[in-house]
Amino acid sequence: MNVQGVEFLACLSSAQRIAAALAVIALGLAGLPEPAAAASGRISIESGGVARTALLIEHRRLKKARRPVVIVLRGGKDRAARLRRVFGFEDMARSSGPVLIYPDPIGGHWSDIAGAEASRDATFIRDLIAKLVSDGVADRHRIFIIGVSSGGPTVLRLACDDANLFTGVAAVVTGMPADLAATCKPSRPLPFLMIAGTADPVVPYKGGKSNWPEGKTDLVSVDAAMAIFVKAAGCGDGRTTTAFPDRDPHDGSRAYLDRWNGCKAPVELVRVEGGGHTIPGHVSAPSVDSARGPRNADIDSAKIIWDFFRRLGD
């Protein structure tokens, strides 16, 4: 501001000076670029002789270049639009630039048991990644995948059978089928993060029959699933446990971060003591919470997952 402007403000009342200053700030902000938007579209490919589709979300104003890709396999009843609201990953598409992919399952659900359907779904994800890489969208060395609820078993199968495809894997309120646990041997140390509630009525923390709408599946315990990735990562003895701040003392749960020591790749568990079959940090309808158990409000699942992935991709 010039000298005349200063003299002018000096003659004004306090209220007038504040109003004038706000006007100047507004003029300055008017010249700034608008927040970047995320563009969405659909991908169609043929996989195994079947037409398959996925929703793609990308940063509209970023230059076209190979970028990190985050693939999210949702639970059976969750549509892509709903999961986008649940996770909040779209905000990261604006600020950090990953391409977000929400593949569509056939018949509304992913296969959670071994067999032709499980093989078909895994092949679809492989074919989808190949297309993203060949089209110059994906950075082959920064491909991440997340499995939520009944979308988790497909992700875990891929982690067991195709560890080299992914830079990092996250599994959220899901479980590992017993048949998979018996044969799972990741080919390399694989960065792995799991978020699980100890009071989950759908996916028992200590193992047992799942209660997914698609059917009941024998699952191993969370500890048994983690042990597979701990072994693959060559971790040492013991783990370090850190409590997250208890931001909501009335939510009936506490969240802890377990980090295994001496690993060649990070292996971490966000253990929600008293948590149900809900994504921590997501606000859902009370009727949903009552059916799925307590919802933890102390942590932001999307931020935890993205921070984990970002450490791997830098």
Q: Where do the PLM segments sit?
A:
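Short beta-strand/loop motif that positions the catalytic acidic residue
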Residues: 194-196
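A domain-start/cap signature at the N-terminus of enzymes
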Residues: 32-69, 95, 99, 115-120, ...
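Serine-hydrolase catalytic machinery in alpha/beta-hydrolase-like enzymes
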Residues: 41-144, 153-157, 161, 206, ...
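Bacterial N-terminal signal peptides that target proteins for export
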Residues: 3-22
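Hydrophobic core
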Residues: 24-31
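Active-site-adjacent alpha-helix of alpha/beta-hydrolase-fold enzymes
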Residues: 198-267, 275, 281-299
